[in-house]
Regions:
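Post-signal peptide N-terminal segment of mature Sec-exported envelope proteins
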Residues: 13-33
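Alpha-helical protein-protein interaction scaffolds
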Residues: 231-351
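Short hydrophobic beta-strand segments
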Residues: 27-37, 226-229
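N-terminal segment of the mature soluble domain
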Residues: 32-125, 165-170, 303, 310-351
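Active-site charged/polar residues at nucleotide-handling catalytic sites that mediate phosphoryl
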Residues: 23, 117-121, 245
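Long, contiguous interaction/recruitment modules in multidomain scaffold/adaptor proteins
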Residues: 66-78, 84-230
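Single conserved hydrophobic/aromatic residue that forms the stacking wall/gate
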Residues: 1-10
Length: 351
């Protein structure tokens, strides 16, 4: 049963980026290459819902994001990942003299001049930043109150430049969203409680600056894992070793528990714990092998023969469902390992 599990946080795991850079590219500049055009926030288009029982009002507006704030946030987040030796920021608009808003990439001459002036090996430029902002007021019947909410969808465009290339190495067009909410006893109060527009636009720009980072450099991702802690004395004793961070001792007891029983459910629990142990040791291939074993035992205990995976009821097969999700994640990490090693070769695989 899932009730026999205890939750734990493992150390962060490193996720590879979409882009890969040669190890010799160690200094980077983050620049603002957006056009210095007037902010073109539109008057919100407000609509009252016909169904006043749920949605009271909805307003949609469009705006240019603050590129200076976004550029600073992107530089800070990239520096925080400690991937490049040096991160330089140039948040002043390179196209400050533009009279008409336009999206224009840097020329090779501009890239060379910037790289020389800033003393860097490559340029990462914010090219454009657009927002779509939706503000709603709803009545939450189950709580007897009103919810004021803002959903800001951000659309950053970022290009990566190398001095020796005539065109960008890559251009990334992304979208993501950030959400705020507050509550009140009336629609007016709920709308008034929500974050002020000025603060919302600033936070949305900061968020937008962080969105491209995981596509550019490897990032650390925190993960949670579950361990089975009951069912036998060795399993309970192993849980104590885990609390003391004595993973090798815990592994010995889990292996003992697995080898000493023919019960499919007990084997499933021990095998899953062993998979987590090997993941903690960065032995992803062994972790995947043991998670596969745990999944096979779970299938025997919780599923009927020839059950279609697409028709699995999670309430009837909670262990099989969780272990399958975990196995999928391990397979993804394993498949990305060679790419991650390539990207981290600048650190001599010390990560």
């Amino acid at each position: 049963s899932i009730r026999r599990q205890r939750q734990m946080c493992i150390r962060d795991s490193l996720q590879p980026a979409d882009l890969s850079f040669p190890p010799q590219l160690r200094k980077v500049a983050i620049v603002n290459n957006t056009s210095n055009a007037p902010d073109d926030k539109l008057t919100p288009q407000t609509k009252k819902s016909k169904d006043n029982r749920v949605e009271i009002s909805r307003a949609i507006a469009y705006a240019n994001g603050d590129p200076k704030v976004a550029t600073e946030a992107m530089a800070e987040e990239i520096a925080h990942q400690n991937y490049f030796d040096e991160v330089v920021i140039c948040d002043s608009a390179l196209r400050a003299n533009d009279k008409i808003s336009r999206e224009s990439t840097l020329s090779q001459e501009e890239v060379r001049q910037l790289a020389s002036d800033l003393g860097v090996d490559l340029i990462i430029a914010l090219e454009n930043l657009q927002f779509k902002i939706t503000k709603t007021v709803r009545y939450l019947e189950e709580f007897g109150c009103y919810q004021g909410a803002i959903d800001a969808k951000v659309y950053p465009t970022v290009s990566v430049y190398l001095p020796e290339r005539s065109k960008p190495m890559a251009t990334i067009r992304l979208n993501d969203s950030i959400f705020w909410e507050d509550f009140g006893i009336s629609p007016t109060e709920a709308a008034a409680q929500i974050i002020p527009t000025k603060d919302m636009l600033k936070e949305a720009a900061e968020f937008a600056g962080t969105v491209p980072v995981k596509y550019i450099v490897p990032i650390w991702k925190n993960g949670k894992r579950y361990l089975y802690t009951g069912g036998s004395v060795p399993m309970r004793d192993a849980a104590i070793y885990v609390r003391e961070n004595s993973w090798d001792e815990a592994y010995g007891l889990w292996n003992q528990a697995y080898q000493s029983t023919k019960n499919e459910k007990k084997k499933m629990r021990a095998a899953l714990n062993i998979a987590v142990y090997y993941e903690m040791k960065d032995s992803l291939a062994k972790a995947e092998k043991w998670a596969t074993t745990a999944q096979q035992h779970a299938r025997k205990t919780e599923l009927k023969k020839n059950t279609d995976n697409n028709k699995i009821n999670t309430d009837e097969a909670p262990n099989y469902f969780y272990i399958s999700l975990y196995l999928t994640e391990l397979k993804e990490r394993n498949a990305q390992l060679s790419k991650l090693k390539l990207q981290m070769s600048r650190f001599n695989d010390d990560f």
